[in-house]
Amino acid sequence: MVDQGCEVANHTHDHKYLTKIGAEGIVSQVGSTNQKIQAVCGVSPVLMRPPGGYIDAASLNVLGSMGMPAIMWSIDTRDWQHRNAQRTIDTVLRQVKDGDIILMHDIYSTTADAAVVLIPELTARGYQLVTVSELAAYRGGIAPGHKYSQFRP
């Protein structure tokens, strides 16, 4: 994935909600996952997506001490819930704006089917598909311990 230009972020080892596991739990979940990703992919993640989107000030503070921001989303396709490719496509195309972060889950075949349609369609509409780090860099950067859902112009 890294060789193809994808960015690999941290999503915890056990999909535990950061707001429920305290500082030690966050350090353990995020730290061990960073180590495993480094071992497998050869890169250490610089971004963290909280499971379920659950994040609070205390969790952000811990992530900040680990040098990581929390990356959220501005479009939730709810693909995990309905598992319908056309519904995912319609949601994205109806809502998408420059600087959006779109939440989709690669574990469902219907999401992959939607991506096959969305990628060329979004490109045809003039959107550039970039990593979150690239998007953040284009729009002024990103800081550890902060939460980001989009990067509007």
Where are these regions (language model features)?
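C-terminal domain-boundary segment and adjacent tail
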Residues: 110-153
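Metal-dependent polysaccharide deacetylase catalytic core of the NodB/CE4 family, i.e.
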Residues: 1-108, 142
